Amino acid sequence: MTLLRLNPTLFCHWRMLLLRPCVVLILWLMVAVWPLSAQAARPLNTDDANVVDPKGCQLETWVRRTRSSTEQWAVPGCNFWGDVEWSLGGQQRSEDTPWTSGLVLGQAKKRWLRLGDGDWGVATTLGFINTQPTSDFNATQRDVYFNAPITRALGQDRFVHLNLGWVQHNRDGSSRPSWGLGGEWPISPRLTAISEVYAETTTPSQYQVGLRLWVKPQRVQIDTTYGNVMGSATDQQWISIGLRLLTPAFLP
């Protein structure tokens, strides 16, 4: 991950990174498909009630580009035992200024009710986010959060996800409820459309729409999204591309 301020050469590099997955997406729409079981994951910010398969791991990585910054994310996670998914990852943010910042995220997600076809799933998540600015003008910030994802299966690989949570902000000592509502609708057995809206109370809601595609069923997935703040013009919009890798069970 680069720590440097974006220059025209780097911007062209990111533009190509954003265009290539779109080309891949179109190509894969032309190939044969077969039935798959869907589950919520990247690129949704609204979490689902599922966890990684027992003794398995995943890596979610993505790039998020706004008008003034580029974020690079990588979040690995594993299910060692007890239907608990442990994740520890980070983000690096490059502004169109001399400043950059880093972020460390860790969480544990427990599945309490396994999702079945035409059924409900319930989980809880407890985690933290540490922001590490490189600027001397900003101190390290730590947020702690709790979230309760609830998933409703509607059949035919259609899902609705509801999140209810709480966030404690270290910077100003404030605590706020958080919420999210998202959905998944299959376009084909490999391709799924997603949409969501989410926020912390007293802050503007954000929305996101996108596509998720299985390149290799249950092992390799790519995605792309567009998002914005409700009621905002184009100055706060973003686009993202992502890659998700899943392993078979291999942990002892």
Model regions: which residues?
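Residue-level detector of bioactive/disordered segments in secreted/extracellular proteins
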Residues: 13-14, 24, 80
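Hydrophobic alpha-helical transmembrane segments of integral membrane proteins
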Residues: 18, 31-32
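Transmembrane beta-barrel domains of Gram-negative outer membranes and organellar outer membranes
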Residues: 39-252
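Sec-dependent N-terminal signal peptides
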Residues: 20-28
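N-terminal secretory signal peptides that target proteins for export/translocation
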Residues: 1-19
